[in-house]
Amino acid sequence: MPVSARAGIVVTGTEVLTGRVQDANGPWIADRLLELGVELAHITICGDRPHDIEAQLRFLADQGVDLIVTSGGLGPTADDMTVEVVARFCGRELVLDAEVEEKIANILKKLMARNPAFQSALDPGTFESLRAANRKQAMVPAGAQVLDPVGTAPGVVVPGKPAVIVLPGPPRELQPMWHTAIQTPAAQQAIAGRTVYRQEMLRMFGLPESGLAETLREAEAAVPGFGQLEITTCLRRGEIEMVTRYEPTAATAYAQLTKLLRDKHGDQLYSEDGSRVDDLVARLLAGRRIATAESCTAGLLAARLTDRPGSSDYVAGGVVAYSNEAKAELLGVDPALIETHGAVSEPVAQAMAAGARQRFAADTAVAITGIAGPGGGTEEKPVGTVCFSVQVGPPGATARSDTRTLRLPGNRLDIRERSTTVAMHLLRRLLTDA
């Protein structure tokens, strides 16, 4: 797919380079660029040393990119060198922006006024020393457009070939600045050659990647214009995400591909608009009251269900019943049931779900009990054995249910995360059929 505007990303910070902090900015900026029709050439990560930062800038310039976006290194400390390096790279002097310096000073005053521990710093003499220490953040490349700070660090956009957008490292500061940064004249000129395209996401669950790959090979011959579709797939939490980018002229080809996938994998294709299973479950739970009973996942499912505003409208509560005694005392599971079938069994999962419905007066419940490892497995029930029970019905009454046992692959973390995904999909299916 021909795309003329190209960009590169430089993520700075020794803490990111060494893995102490996971990079959230690179992927986020990449998504925003792709949404704009800008081809992403490279994402590079380097430490805080100036010559390393400059080397990354020169590398990207040598690749012929039209735009470089950097994140990090805009603070007041000695190792925050990104703006200085970018100025040198662009052949521009650093100058003090008095207006920005005043804005930073006002931000500092407000922050300190809200924190009693810093009240003494508001003394005029002390504050002036602090203000001077932060003055570095108001030094910007001559001719650059300054982006108002969200924290205390302003961003800058430096015109040129390539143009450079310099953004702070904390995502909570970087993301609000992005829209303003990309709308600046320098950034718009840099990406003027971008291709207008559409991007769609399909989500599938229960379909192996090999199965999707086989269908896509079939589509190459069966779908006219298939070659105009840029398709990427990603396996995440046991699901397949398929992202397709295409120019508007290839819309018919995409529609035919979607129909082929729907015809062959309709049971596994659960989202055609990019909605996550969490989104779908939240909608399906409207007007209901759900409770969870978890053993091996230790509250991860409850956390996932409540990881959105408004979840208190339908989440009643949850129980983490890790021990057999907790299953009996908190969920009313008969100890004889555990003795006969074992804690990791379908009868116990059913009893846990019924107990959760009863305890929270809920009409919907999900129970998970399993062996996440690395120990605890047996020949009959190896590590990765997980039992699920989803129930829909008034507490104390007979409920519609789906109870099953699965063997999930991976390490302890993988098994626990996959278990929550399976539970969400079992819940989605049962509620959809309600």
Swiss-Prot record:
It comes from the Bacteria. Transmembrane segments: none annotated. CDD domains: cinA. It holds the Pfam family CinA. InterPro entries: CinA, CinA-like_C, CinA_C, Competence-induced_CinA, MoaB/Mog-like_dom_sf, MoaB/Mog_dom. Belongs to the CinA family. HAMAP family: CinA_B. This is CinA-like protein. It comes from Mycobacterium avium (strain 104).
